[in-house]
UniProtKB/Swiss-Prot annotation:
This protein's name: Glycerol kinase
Protein source organism: Saccharolobus islandicus (strain L.S.2.15 / Lassen #1)
Residues that coordinate or bind ADP: T16, R20, T264, G307, G408
PANTHER family reported in the protein's UniProt record: GLYCEROL KINASE (PTHR10196:SF69), SUGAR KINASE (PTHR10196)
Catalytic activity: glycerol + ATP = sn-glycerol 3-phosphate + ADP + H(+)
InterPro entries: ATPase_NBD (IPR043129), Carb_kinase_FGGY (IPR000577), Carb_kinase_FGGY_CS (IPR018483), FGGY_C (IPR018485), FGGY_N (IPR018484), Glycerol_kin (IPR005999)
Gene Ontology terms: biological process: glycerol catabolic process; glycerol metabolic process; glycerol-3-phosphate metabolic process
Length: 501
């Protein structure tokens, strides 16, 4: 094709294990993809770090590959999406990181967040929508300020910058001209008041974090600065955390629209509109903001183990050689044969929040085969998704009529049909499964006027397949009741047998 007349949007997707760059055309078709892995660093048990320089190098290699077939002058916008919460502090003058990036999985700051949980839980949940946990950026920033020599002193002199990885990449791409983040990423720091849409001074003072190190918080779609890294100036005009970008990429623009991303674990986000809803069992987060001082909010539920259970079936039990074999194996049986699998390898996430739960296979008889267990593993993903969606409906009072899906397991037709059956609602799989990158490409294109409205984006978005529920209500109720019983037996198990959390 003659690409010279085409306009393209470049999405940078900075993940936990690799940096990707995906080039989209103006009809949101994928033109090319670049992907490079970068090393994980584990200096001590519970510590997980990345070298920001290695991330930058991997990201630039990915960009080079993605744009190799076009002229960079045809790129009208760049959007950035990222692993959320991961924290970098760097020297404002030299641009050099003062310490490795502390990754969202890192647990070293548990003593800090245990103290916050014991003394300030309600205040933090009310203001930020989050629960005190090492997962979020605030305690990671405090740890670096307290433990890396001279950093606190430099921070107090205004010589240190903080950012999640979107902020760091924008800083690098603009040669230090822009120190910004968007509402969605700011809402994952545990320093941002999601009601007032500003950094919270009370929490900053509590953790002794100087406000001067924080980036300016802007809408998710506007020009933040211009990239100087590709030979010509290109506007950087979209920014969103990965899960929020996926919600946008699923065109979930209306209240009650919901998406599930099936990865190693799963993330379920629901658009709840312009007012934050307080939730007992879920996180309240900012989905995006398309204009200043106005945000769209989401409820978020995270499931710790979904796709990782298939990896365990493959590597731990050696029951299959490759992950793709699980669907045909599970298809060999009509149903689960009464077998339930609760994948509580590291406890249970939303809505149970039980770190003492442990994995369980129950209902085994002499007639149970490998295929029944394979089916039970797939079904556990659907049951856990229903667990979260039921809480979302109950706590929001919003009726959910369909579920949009993406991620690796969404390609599995057997699982997606069962997901529709056990929920009793339609499940919709999009044509383009790279919803995270597509979401931030949409935001970037909106920011420069390549697309003019959410309606225009919705009209471009395409469905691959819809799964319509065909199970009777009686069977649905019986199967889900069995799942709830199995979960009850898995909960608290590590306490019973004295296992480690």
């Amino acid at each position: 094709m003659n690409t010279m007349s085409h306009k393209f949007v470049l999405a940078l997707d900075e993940g936990t294990t690799s940096a990707r760059a995906i080039l989209f055309d103006s009809d949101l078709n994928i033109v090319n993809i670049g992907q490079y892995e970068f090393p994980q660093h584990y200096p001590q048990p519970g510590y997980v770090e990345h070298d920001p320089e290695e991330i930058w190098e991997a990201q630039m290699l990915a960009v080079k590959k993605a744009i190799s077939k076009i002229d960079a002058k045809q790129i009208v916008a760049i959007g950035i999406t990222n692993q959320r919460e991961t924290t970098v502090l760097w020297d404002a003058k030299s641009g050099k990181p003062v310490y490795n990036a502390i990754v969202w999985q890192d647990r070293r700051t548990s003593p800090i967040t245990d103290w916050l949980k014991a003394n300030y839980f309600k205040m933090i949940k009310d203001k930020t929508g989050l629960v005190p946990d090492p997962y979020f950026s605030a305690s990671k920033i405090k740890w670096i300020l307290d433990n890396v020599p001279n950093v606190r002193e430099k921070a107090e002199r205004g010589e240190i910058k903080f950012g999640t990885l979107d902020t760091y990449l924008i800083w690098r791409l603009t040669n230090g001209k822009a120190h910004v983040t968007d509402y969605s990423n700011a809402s994952r720091t545990m320093l941002f008041n999601i009601n007032k849409l500003e950094c919270d001074r009370e929490i900053l003072e509590l953790l002794k974090i100087p406000e001067s190190i924080l980036p300016e918080v802007k809408p998710s779609s506007e020009i933040y600065g211009y990239s100087e890294a590709l030979g010509n100036l290109i506007p950087i005009s979209g920014d969103a955390g990965d899960q929020q970008a996926a919600l946008f990429g699923q065109v979930a623009f209306n209240v009650g629209e919901i998406k599930a991303t099936y990865g190693t674990g799963s993330f379920i986000l629901m658009n709840i509109g312009n007012n934050p809803i307080r939730s007992e069992n879920l996180l309240t987060t900012i989905a995006w903001g398309l204009e200043k001082n106005k945000a769209t909010y989401a409820l978020e539920g995270s499931i710790f183990i979904t796709g990782a259970a298939v990896q365990w079936f493959r590597d731990g039990l050696r029951a299959i050689d490759v992950s793709d074999e699980i669907e045909p194996l599970a298809s060999n049986v009509e149903d689960n044969g009464g077998v339930y699998f609760v994948p509580a390898f590291v406890g249970l996430g939303a809505p149970y929040w039980d770190p003492y739960a442990r994995g369980l296979i129950i209902g085994i008889t002499r007639g149970t085969t490998k295929a029944h267990i394979a089916r039970a593993i797939l079904e556990s993903m659907a049951y856990q998704t229903r667990d979260v969606i039921e809480v979302m409906q109950k706590e929001s009072g919003i009726s959910i009529n369909s579920l949009k899906v993406d991620g690796g397991a969404a390609k599995d037709n057997l699982l997606m049909q069962f997901q529709a059956d056990i929920l009793g609602i339609k499940v919709i799989r999009p044509k383009v499964m790279e919803t995270t990158s597509m979401g931030v490409a949409m935001l970037a294109g909106l920011g420069v006027g390549l697309w003019n409205s959410l309606e225009e984006l919705r009209s471009i978005w395409k469905v691959d397949k819809e799964f319509i529920p065909s199970m009777s209500e009686e069977k649905r109720r019986a199967l889900y009741s069995g799942w709830k019983e199995a979960v009850k037996r898995a909960m608290g198990w590590a306490k019973v047998v004295g296992g480690q959390v």
